[in-house]
Amino acid sequence: MSFSVDVLANIAIELQRGIGHQDRFQRLITTLRQVLECDASALLRYDSRQFIPLAIDGLAKDVLGRRFALEGHPRLEAIARAGDVVRFPADSELPDPYDGLIPGQESLKVHACVGLPLFAGQNLIGALTLDGMQPDQFDVFSDEELRLIAALAAGALSNALLIEQLESQNMLPGDAAPFEAVKQTQMIGLSPGMTQLKKEIEIVAASDLNVLISGETGTGKELVAKAIHEASPRAVNPLVYLNCAALPESVAESELFGHVKGAFTGAISNRSGKFEMADNGTLFLDEIGELSLALQAKLLRVLQYGDIQRVGDDRSLRVDVRVLAATNRDLREEVLAGRFRADLFHRLSVFPLSVPPLRERGDDVILLAGYFCEQCRLRLGLSRVVLSAGARNLLQHYRFPGNVRELEHAIHRAVVLARATRSGDEVILEAQHFAFPEVTLPPPEAAAVPVVKQNLREATEAFQRETIRQALAQNHHNWAACARMLETDVANLHRLAKRLGLKD
């Protein structure tokens, strides 16, 4: 079988139609799955000896949250080391990273697998993976045809990464440095709230403004601080962390500003405080609302004038520190109650960021669950850790008062319980492995009884017609997105729509 010019042109056109990188990547993967007639396809980005999924089709949604470290996935390591198409034999002893992650085929092992490394010049930037349930599924495609596919995908990914690099470095195109993969904190989530937060982080990171990060306990405020620091001009200098809630009043000032020998009982030598340690870098003050009013006044002086005094020393030291502060309190309410200084609040909240709670992040809970499942798999030396449909349903309907931290602990506990109930190194997490209190799953909706008389075929077609109409409306008449939502092949969807009179 050979690709026609029309097929290649269709792939190129789909890449251009996309609005933004993510949409282009998804169009590419969906189109490839149709053209190659595979059961699953994925576009992965390579970063620091791990592959990060950017777009998937035919795989469980939690795959987007997983991070595939090379040391834990020998097939992906083989793809990363290869300079060309990699075909794994059907009887390969190397485990497939997607075993158990193809919906409807969880108990079956993937048989056919092809890996296409993607390069920008000599640099490995990603990979395309193609998987099928039939051993000879990709034999009809020559290596040359697959190289053409890889070239199109590599071009799209390389352009996206270069634009990302230019935006993060705020450079003009003429000043662009050669593409280099830079490891940065991964903030997992595609929900509107997280997408907006990532944009705001990109904006404020390039500045030197102080930032106030608010959010409930367990939402990931420290992760936001790390992301800001790593994307800032201060990234080459230290990020120093201080938990204000864990500071006894007697040592809080010394922790922040340092002390000199003899300043108090037990001060047997000079000691630098967190501000000195963070000089030319960033200081992250977690739970800043716990600081006393006296310390708040001294912190305000540092922010205003840039100098500190060690405890027991009359001399001032100049410091150049960017302050990122976090709180789970409503500091406006604290100001009104007289527990937090208004002037300090205004100094810190020049660019406030709010981290959304997990219950408001929709399907992000499944992506994060996939991330934690992969972490557990590596730590415990398991071949695979997958979520059953029942477990996914439970996670999506639990409200998680402890947010991401609670989800992480719940996944770890569930893996331990599931592992204890079955032999072998494969773990499938079921709903009963989670101990969430007061979880009420929505009852199945009762089917409406038709008022008019219809035979079974007419009723089925009416249901299909209405379902497709609603899906098209929700996806702005994008057929590929509609097919993903309905979990069907887009070509089959087109044929069904024509038969139902929805298309000419």
Swiss-Prot record:
Residue ranges annotated for the Sigma-54 factor interaction domain, each copy included: 187-416
A GO biological-process term: phosphorelay signal transduction system
DNA-binding region boundaries: 479-498
Entry-linked SMART domains: AAA (SM00382), GAF (SM00065)
Annotated keywords: ATP-binding, DNA-binding, Nucleotide-binding, Phosphoprotein, Transcription, Transcription regulation
Its job: Required for the expression of anaerobic nitric oxide (NO) reductase, acts as a transcriptional activator for at least the norVW operon. Activation also requires sigma-54.
HAMAP family linked: NorR (MF_01314)
Protein name, entry field: Anaerobic nitric oxide reductase transcription regulator NorR
Recorded name of the encoding gene: norR
